[in-house]
Amino acid sequence: MKQLESQPFQSKLNLNSEEFENNKSSMLEMISELNELLDEAEAGGGPDHHKRLAARGKLPVRERVFHFLDPDSPFLEISGLAAYKSEYPIGGGAFAGIGVSSGIECVIFANDPTVLAGAMHFYSVKKWMRCMQIARDCRIPFIQFVESAGGDLRPRAGAAVGGMGHFAESGRQFYEITELSKLNIPTVTVAFGTATAGGAYQPGMSDYNIFVKNQADVALAGPPLVQMATGEISSREDIGGAKMHAEKSGLAEYLAEDDLDGIRIAREVMSHLNWDKEGNNPRFEIAPPKYSQEDLLGIIEPSLK
């Protein structure tokens, strides 16, 4: 591989100047604030919700994603501060990013069941759409870890975004999933729990589906609404259970025993895709930076926007 020849940039930065020290100090304070917000997003719905999730034998959303990724592989989180300064929790009730699974770069979008039972709203929908756009533009597989109560349709008093504000866009969201398939970009979904209404369309529009036994519940509506509309008395397993979808509807290609088994199967599916991202590979070796990246903290003034 040919090395690109160029003259190294000579820095004139004075690391001992007062201006540099002031800028660096201000930047470190802002980074600390950013990390606190990211920690808040990671906490999701709080310890009580995480305890209830663990009591049902389920993994937190971030553990699901990191078990899916190759060990020690790079991961770039997407929209970690979604819904910041809104009426919804930071992170938008979802965890997303670009990572590597079975050696294949992919985009992962995962509902956080500890936040509003994974219900989707204006901010989480925007995050979801951004993930699909990246998958489409970069031609890399799109992975969904689904556990969602569907759309949050509740009216919220004083909310900047009404409960129905995102609902009109739902058709576009599902269209984008099918567009990925049309472009031969693989879509893989693991259903870890309830996927109601709009949440049911996530696996419904995907190429490969893995449902966790006795947990996945994929249906447009639950038994009470079915009884109200048709008079039929049914169970959740009858309407949307994993076993039913594997044996009758055909929506589920794979049945998993638990969360970890579902993730294992998803990694196997990835390994069988035989997928290569289109585009040019690096054409030359890249040398490490001459100067420390920490020096960047003292260059930019904190008031610069």
Positions of the model-derived regions?
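Amphipathic alpha-helical segments at domain termini/boundaries
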Residues: M1-S79, L220-K305
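Residue-level detector of solvent-exposed, low-hydrophobicity positions
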Residues: N16, M27, F66, F75, ...
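Long, structured ligand/cofactor-binding scaffold of large enzymes
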Residues: K51-V188
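Conserved catalytic cores of soluble enzyme domains
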Residues: V146-E278
